[in-house]
């Protein structure tokens, strides 16, 4: 702009900084949320769906969900073919220590490779959209099948500190827009995709939250957290292995 400040810095100042208080002061909001999760999950095997990546945020949130908040999550992991051993070992250690059954969906590796190559060929900025869309689509599918009313999302401002550029927000965002992804594959993918699960912006943004009443929540924004504190807790409690920088548990995002 006229002051030499880039648009990304302005987006940070407008979208992130006003909300970033390190999760302080949300005790009553969190208590009410947890009470509602337990109430709506009464009489069911699970009271929430929990997507586990093996990264720091999801690992710490699972610790809180089970050990501190006494929730009964359906723990789900998508193996899109890019897992690094550190992620798989961290997932195993935490689930074993907490006595949780881990449900794994392994994607067709050749389909994932070809979809990823299609995004490279297209010169697309959101290169992780194929794996991210599979996460969204499978969890949308689980929400319909299990009947639970809450999905726990590990995103939090304290460790993310960024927002996606506004130019990425089309439909449900590239990762949530199955129509957009299918169209890109029609132009750039060299093989038919038959086993991959797609969702749509309508299903993800309208059907699931409003017609089925399933809420996706980000509880780590409601508790005081820092990267060092989360890491220390996980190392002491579960023998968690730190993996360096953000998203370095995954070969693609690393």
Question: Which residues are covered by each model-predicted region?
Answer:
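Hydrophobic positions on the alpha1 helix immediately C-terminal to the Walker A/P-loop
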Residues: 60-61
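Nucleotide-activated chemistry modules centered on ATP-dependent adenylation/adenylyltransferase
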Residues: 1-48, 64-254
């Amino acid at each position: 702009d006229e002051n030499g400040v880039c648009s990304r810095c302005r987006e940070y100042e407008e979208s992130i900084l006003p909300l970033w208080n390190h999760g302080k002061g949300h005790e009553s909001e969190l208590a009410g949320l947890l009470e509602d999760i337990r109430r709506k999950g009464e009489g069911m095997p699970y009271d929430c769906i929990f997507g586990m990546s093996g990264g720091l945020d999801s690992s710490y949130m699972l610790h809180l969900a089970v050990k501190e908040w006494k929730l009964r999550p359906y723990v789900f992991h998508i193996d899109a073919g890019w897992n690094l051993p550190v992620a798989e070992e961290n997932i195993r250690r935490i689930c074993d220590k907490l006595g949780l059954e881990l449900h794994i969906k392994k994607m067709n590796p050749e389909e994932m490779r070809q979809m990823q190559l299609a995004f490279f060929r297209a010169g697309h900025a959101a290169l992780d959209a194929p794996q991210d869309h599979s996460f969204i689509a499978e969890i949308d599918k689980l929400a319909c099948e299990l009947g639970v009313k809450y999905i726990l999302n590990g995103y939090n401002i304290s460790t993310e500190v960024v927002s996606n550029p506004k130019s990425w927000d089309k439909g449900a965002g590239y990762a949530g827009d199955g129509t957009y992804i299918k169209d890109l594959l029609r132009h750039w993918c060299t093989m038919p995709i038959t086993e991959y699960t797609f969702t749509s912006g309508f299903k993800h943004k309208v059907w699931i939250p409003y017609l089925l009443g399933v809420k996706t929540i980000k509880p780590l924004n409601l508790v005081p957290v820092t990267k060092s504190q989360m890491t220390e807790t996980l190392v002491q409690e579960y023998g968690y292995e730190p993996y360096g920088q953000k998203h370095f548990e995954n070969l693609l995002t690393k």
